[in-house]
UniProtKB/Swiss-Prot annotation:
Superkingdom: Bacteria
InterPro entries: Aldolase_TIM, PdxS/SNZ, PdxS/SNZ_N, RibuloseP-bd_barrel
Organism expressing this protein natively: Streptomyces coelicolor (strain ATCC BAA-471 / A3(2) / M145)
Gene (name only): pdxS
Binding site for D-glyceraldehyde 3-phosphate: 174
Active-site residues, as the UniProt record annotates them: 90
Protein's name in the database: Pyridoxal 5'-phosphate synthase subunit PdxS
Binding site for D-ribose 5-phosphate: 33, 162, 223, 244-245
């Protein structure tokens, strides 16, 4: 699909059911950030269900500063050509033209990501205008439901990307799960009040109350660096994990990647997790999230 739409050409769109179904296929797996075709192959060989193609992992984006934008199309296409598993790529929040470009390149999923510098401080992209399913981050249930109302087919609890510190991932996933549990058993009057409090459509709030979960897949992200971290997020209710800097900023990326996949699959078996954690080399150097100023907290981006 061309990223430039003529006045008489309606954008190609896909149904929410189809896009959500595509995301369902990733449940139980690990999605890994990669910056080269070689890294993408390592991720695929390790058992990743998808890769995220980007020029810099979050740890490097955090270190380098400046404006972080969509990755170069040649780099993305190189990764698409290197692997048989799905390829995701990031667009800036509200930058629907970057999303159009990514769709034209043939990526399998678009991540409207707070890790990149937001392009719009008021609006997120209209995700119903695309055939390609979108992934979006959330720190709480209201944020998750607002993204779903815009057409997101997958939610990831944000965590704090590029820190190697799982504490914010735990906080955000627990927040979402606790708020979902709170809605169980609410009557209509209480659901209307909850929708107002969450700043989310009543119909979605009611659906979550009835299902006892989000109507889309919920993964966890931000700070997962070890097999135990991945298993922790799964035991807390994540249906899969994103791993960014934690693999290719470690001492032995191939071994760590395979270990995190194994721990994500067998997340409720401590013996397997222990075996997967042996002799992995050095983990990435972590950051204490308490030391991050508000302006450097990626999770605060989005509304």
């Amino acid at each position: 699909m061309s990223s430039t739409l003529s006045e008489n050409q309606a954008p190609e769109t896909g149904t929410a059911r189809v896009k959500r179904g595509m995301a369902e296929q990733l449940k139980g797996g690990v999605i890994m950030d990669v910056v080269t075709p070689e890294q993408a192959k390592i991720a695929e060989d390790a058992g990743a269900v998808a890769v995220m193609a980007l020029e810099r992992v979050p740890a490097d984006i955090r270190k380098d500063g400046g404006v972080a934008r969509m990755s170069d199309p040649d780099m993305i296409e190189g990764i698409i050509g290197a692997v048989s598993i799905p390829v995701m790529a990031k667009s800036r929040i509200g930058h629907f033209v970057e999303a159009q470009v990514l769709q034209s390149l043939g990526v399998d999923y678009i991540d409207e990501s707070e890790v990149l510098t937001p392009a719009d401080e008021v609006n997120h992209s209209d995700k119903f205008a695309f055939t390609t399913p979108f992934v979006c981050g959330a720190t709480n249930l209201g944020e998750a439901l607002r993204r779903i109302a815009e057409g997101a087919a997958m939610i990831r609890s944000k965590g704090e990307a590029g820190t190697g510190n799982v504490v914010e991932a735990v906080r955000h996933l627990r927040q979402i799960k606790n708020e979902i549990a709170r809605l169980r058993g609410y009557d209509n009057n209480e659901l209307y009040a909850a929708a107002k409090e969450l700043r989310a459509p009543y119909e979605l709030v009611k659906e979550v109350s009835e299902l006892g979960r989000l109507p889309v897949v919920l993964f966890s992200a931000g700070g997962v660096a070890t097999p135990a971290d991945a298993a922790l997020m799964r035991q807390l209710g994540a249906e899969g994990v994103f791993v960014g800097s934690g693999i290719f900023k470690s001492g032995d990326p191939a071994k760590r990647a395979a270990a995190i996949v194994k721990a994500t699959t067998f997340y409720d078996d401590p013996k397997i997790i222990a075996d997967a954690s042996r002799n992995l080399g050095e983990a990435m150097v972590g950051i204490n999230c308490d030391t991050l100023p508000e302006t450097e907290r990626y999770a605060n981006r989005g509304w």
